[in-house]
Amino acid sequence: MSWGTNVLVGQSGGPTAVINSSLAGVYEAAKALGAAHVYGMEYGIQGLLQGKIVDLDDRLDDKMEIELLKRTPSSYLGSCRFKLPNPATDERPFVQLFELFAKYCIGAVFYIGGNDSMDTIAKLSAYGAAKGSEIRFIGVPKTIDNDLMYTDHTPGYGSAAKYIATILKEVICDSSVYDIRSVTVAEIMGRHTGWLAGAASLAAGADCNGPDIILLPERPF
């Protein structure tokens, strides 16, 4: 497989510790497969609709820059929380986006994100197929919630799970120093899934018994 045309990549939703590693991976793979240019959306699909697009070849012009990107926190290209409408209801943003794809000779679009980002790339793919477009639309999973279907461990989940286990261990140890007993309740992110809450069990070890109770949305309490 080779990509003789240009590639476009964007980031969306909340940043994770490894979202820029995925961006670096897309860039390196696209160049290895012959992409003439790799463009980046600034501030996701919302920024793209405002014409905010950069040539990543100008920014990632040597190996050191790419290696630094892999270890850079937050979202290098910026992010957004923007959902595309149903094209049957409002086709205007789709027309605008496909005009931009044509202007920059885009042959493949990568969108790095979670549930809403996958919804965006799915809508673009369906719209393109309906219009006979040959552009390939590819979703790159990213979510600390670990709640994307058919994905065992989403990039970002492991880092968040480790962070939660570390924080809970510190909270438990701090709470144990007082003679007066207390009850501490920690509310963990995760949308509608309990993967992150379950990761709190990793706080248990030789120096800590871990949480007394872990409540998961999948199990009634």
Segments and roles (model prediction):
Residues 140-153, 180:
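Acidic/polar active-site rim loop that often engages polyanionic ligands
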Residues 100, 108-113, 119-134, 154-221:
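Accessory alpha-helical/coil subdomains and C-terminal extensions
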Residues 2-53:
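N-terminal phosphate-binding or glycine-rich loops at protein starts, especially the Walker A/P-loop
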Residues 12-14, 41-47, 81-82, 114-115, ...:
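Short, ordered loop/turn segments at secondary-structure junctions
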Residues 16-26, 48-49, 92-95, 115-123, ...:
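Short glycine/serine/threonine-rich phosphate/pyrophosphate-binding segments
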Residues 2-7, 33-36, 71-74, 104-108, ...:
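Short coil/turn connectors at secondary-structure junctions
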Residues 1, 51-107, 116, 144, ...:
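Glycine-rich oxoanion-binding loops at beta->alpha junctions
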Residues 6-16, 75-81, 107-113, 139, ...:
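Short glycine-rich or small-residue beta-strand-to-loop segments that form or flank ligand, phosphate
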